[in-house]
A protein has these predicted regions:
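Core register positions within helices of long alpha-helical scaffolds
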Residues: 82-86, 128-131, 170-174, 208-211, ...
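Intrinsically disordered, low-complexity regulatory regions
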Residues: 1-72, 81-83, 248, 270-295, ...
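Charged catalytic carboxylate motif
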Residues: 78, 124, 167, 204, ...
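Elongated alpha-helical scaffolds that mediate protein-protein interactions in large eukaryotic proteins
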Residues: 2-111, 118-124, 132-154, 161-166, ...
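Eukaryote-specific, cytoplasm-facing alpha-helical/coiled-coil scaffolding segments in long proteins
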Residues: 110, 153-154, 201, 329-332, ...
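Solenoid-like repeat scaffolds
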Residues: 117, 158, 195-196, 229-233
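A short glycine-/small-residue-rich loop at the edge of a beta-strand within enzyme catalytic domains
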Residues: 218, 233, 253, 293, ...
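Eukaryotic modular interaction domains in large regulatory/scaffold proteins
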Residues: 226, 241, 260, 264-270, ...
Length: 441
């Protein structure tokens, strides 16, 4: 038999629930505001005490209302925050199960894809998915089984809020950890994100891919082309993350395709540059935008990446030699349509010349004494000193400085000139240093 006190508490609960059931949109928002203010941070037992062991009855009502109105575009933030109080409460697994039983995960994922729902509401939906994913492996699997990876990745690509995008990254990282059944699905979803039009989404996807790659192990065949395509970006912070991922990927089974791809980018296809020439003849204003042509941006980024890889690993430098990287670098140095390609290719070539006497000999013969002396004086500003004839000499070079072109390359044929190499590295990476200094401010 219940006590008078318990009966009074039950009566208050029933009165509260009846008020909710009879309330319109405005009053329900007021009820939720009060609920959030008085119950945020409470544990499961504390919520039960607050609702006289009937907290689930209120959760079901709030969730049902969410499912009824979420497609209308009405504000959902208070509803989602109220549900979050239940799901995040300590000792609240019961609430989570009740939320999932009535299709909570599917509702949260569908919210992400509805255009008329505002960004803040979608961010709250992501936060609830984070809570669910952090509860355990089977809940991560449930999200993935509900086509969650695709919905979450598409939202990351379309989101206009950097803060929201960072919340999505946290969710994707959670889904790739401790989720062996679906970690490959998350990994492929991240790769699919790379061509998207949002620089922030690209950057976050690249960062998360580094983590995912170390967990998954085996690489997906499409990752090479996707990452190399990202090098055409005009955004230095995206380029930086792409190069960082490439530095990891060369330790996997895509090492050779990656290196071949980078060397190939040094020499854009003739059809691409021919298209540009035709446009220039028909529209002189195109001249002002050639520095942003994707193939030239890729060319410059490839020269930078090759320099970083070669400086970090001498064995890689030798592999690059065998892929005729010197020929490609000199060709890029002759690209008068893109000065940054010339500058970065020149700095990278300087390293190979310093490290390999074989390269030094062939480059000197190909350039001629006058041009080679200009190169030695200051590789970084060589592009400002050369004329059109010298540029043509570089672009049309026939250098074939590979290990096959001499008897051998061993330690005795490698020059370690640390002083000038350090100077080259400073000039070579100054874009990244500027970027990092800004991010620290």
């Amino acid at each position: 038999m219940t006590s008078v006190k318990e009966q009074a508490a039950i009566s208050r609960l029933l009165s509260f629930l009846q008020e909710w059931d009879n309330a319109g949109k405005g009053l329900r928002n007021q009820i939720l505001t009060t609920f959030i203010e008085t119950n945020e941070g409470k544990t499961g037992p504390e919520l039960e005490l607050e609702f006289s062991q009937g907290a689930s009855l209120f959760l079901i009502r709030v969730t049902t209302w969410l499912r009824i109105i979420y497609m209308t575009g009405l504000e959902l933030e208070k509803i989602l925050r109220s549900i979050g109080i239940f799901l995040s409460a300590v000792s609240s697994n019961r609430y989570l199960l009740e939320f999932l039983e009535i299709g909570g995960v599917l509702t949260l994922l569908e919210i992400l894809g509805i255009e008329k729902i505002n960004e803040e509401d979608k961010k709250e939906s992501i936060k609830l998915l984070q809570i669910i994913a952090n509860t355990g492996r089977k809940y991560k699997e449930l999200i993935c089984e509900s086509y969650g990876v695709r919905a979450i990745a598409e939202f990351l690509a379309k989101s206009k809020s950097e803060e929201t995008q960072e919340e999505v990254q946290v969710l994707l990282e959670t889904l790739v950890h401790g989720n062996p059944k679906y970690q490959n699905q998350v990994y492929k979803g991240l790769i699919a994100l790379l061509p998207c039009g949002s620089p922030k989404a690209q950057r976050l996807a690249l960062q998360t891919l580094k983590t995912a790659q170390s967990i998954v192990g085996a690489t997906h065949p499409s990752i090479v082309d996707r990452v190399l395509t990202v090098l055409s970006t005009v955004h230095l912070e995206v380029q930086y993350e792409a190069i960082e991922l490439i530095k990891d990927l060369i330790h996997y089974d895509v090492r050779l395709p990656l290196l071949k791809g980078l060397v190939a980018l040094l020499m854009p296809p003739v059809k691409e540059t021919s298209k540009l020439q035709a446009k220039i003849f028909s529209d002189s204003s195109i001249l002002q935008t050639t520095t942003q042509l994707p193939v030239f941006l890729q060319q410059a980024a490839a020269a930078k990446t090759i320099g970083i890889l070669a400086r970090n690993d001498l064995n890689l430098a030798v592999e690059l030699l065998n892929l005729r990287v010197v020929h490609g670098l000199m060709s890029a140095m002759g690209n008068t349509d893109h000065s940054n390609s010339q500058r970065l290719a020149s700095l990278t070539l300087e390293y190979f010349v310093q490290m390999f006497p074989l390269v030094e000999e062939q480059v000197r013969k190909s350039m001629g004494d006058e041009l080679y002396q200009l190169f030695l004086n200051d590789a970084e500003i060589l592009y400002t000193k050369i004329d059109s004839i010298q540029a043509d000499i570089l672009a049309a070079n026939k250098v074939n400085a590979t290990t096959d072109s001499c008897d051998c390359i061993d330690n005795s044929s490698i020059s370690f000139s640390t002083g000038s190499n350090d100077m080259s590295q400073r000039g070579y990476t100054n874009d990244f240093e500027k970027l990092h200094s800004k991010s620290k401010e």
